[in-house]
Amino acid sequence: MGGYMNVNKNKQVIIYYFTALISGFCIMGIETSATRILSPYFGSTTLIWLIEISLIMICIGIGNYFGGKRADKLVKTRTCEERIVKNLLISFLFICTVPLTSKIVIMGSIILASEVQLGNIIMISSIICSIVLFSVPLIFMGTISPLLAKISITSLDETGNVMGNLYLFNIFGSVLGTMIPTILVIPKIGVKRSFLLFGAVLAIILILYSKKIKKNFLLNSIICVLWLCMSLYLSTTSLAFDKPVHEEESEYNYINVSQNDDGKLALKTNVFFGAQSIKVDKNKKKSGYYYDEFVKINNLLDDKVKHKILIIGYGTGTMSTLLHKNFDNFEVTGIEIDRNIVNLRELYFNKSDDKIIISDGRNYLNSTDEMYDLIILDVYQNISMPINLTTREFFEDCKAHLNRNGIIALNIGLGNSLNSNLVLALSGTLKCVCPNVYKYKTKSDNNVIVYGSEKNLELSLKEQKLLTKK
């Protein structure tokens, strides 16, 4: 009889460990997906990650606190399991509503922050969105761990072992919840459908518990199936407010191809702010955007048979297209980390024979011996920026790959002024590497171009009207 009870007890504990794993998987999956669903609207800066991580830790802490209080009041194992089912059901319902309500909540939070003038609109809006969309399911998910501890520990002698195993499975689930959405789920089915996947996983575990305690099994099963089907049917995978020409989510970016107000196709990696590439008209040598001023940098190079230009942040090749239309004495190497973006060049944008390398810009520089006359860094904007391409060491790597009198040119987007914190920080860091640094405020798009070189470029920049006085 004792052997049978031990086997039965072991089976129950295994279920509890599995629940801890699923809990960790869903919590970290929500964190990863939450950042991805907000980044097209608010960017993917450290600030957004800070908000998401802080919110999740606070919500889990609140859930742990109240879950522990509740667990102490529940004497029987069955009542604890009933509470787990209820909390999982609430989390499931709220997680599955994220695809339905995210756009409304995001737009509402932006309007609220703008109207009330609460300060940093992006920061305040993202905080409001995070609280409204994710706090409730995360708090209820946070109650699961203390409830599991309550029913898993049957004697003080095994407390350490049981708690260690619960933590182990929870952490393992967290690792899976971090990796699987980023690498597999989001690129394949999109970030909105990923929330439905987490909901489906929770539905499975709560239905298993309902069957185990023999209470509301049929009702909970019907609720889960109907709610999932409704969310799947009513929600769309699109994150844009209008209807884009093309939309997808890659391992690195949200990708949107749509028409600008002037009718030109534009590639965007966000919903509200700017464009990363545009399609240049076949019979025109100008785009009507800041690129027209940027490509005049080619005139600053020393006369020679052929210039070699490196573009880090190639996108779909707008900069290169305009260079080819206006000059013929150069060759371009383009570095772009996102293969999906490069693939769109052939489908929607201008074709070229440029050498395109799928790589991180810094990794490429560290793995090549090629030298260039001009290195263009088109990767900087307020809401999304690769931090590894902002350091002194990176600019030193760039300089090490410049020919004599070569130029480093930074394009800093999204309405920065000459004295904005971002422009001052990047130009100051570049100044540590290049003795001559200059800034230019473009007439269109409000971008800032920062140049760095060993050579004094002031007269040449004035001749080309590419220098803005402070």
Put a short name on every predicted segment.
Residues 253-258:
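Short, surface-exposed beta-strand/loop micro-motifs that present aromatic residues
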Residues 2-247, 259-262, 271-276, 299-308, ...:
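Alpha-helical transmembrane segments of multi-pass membrane proteins
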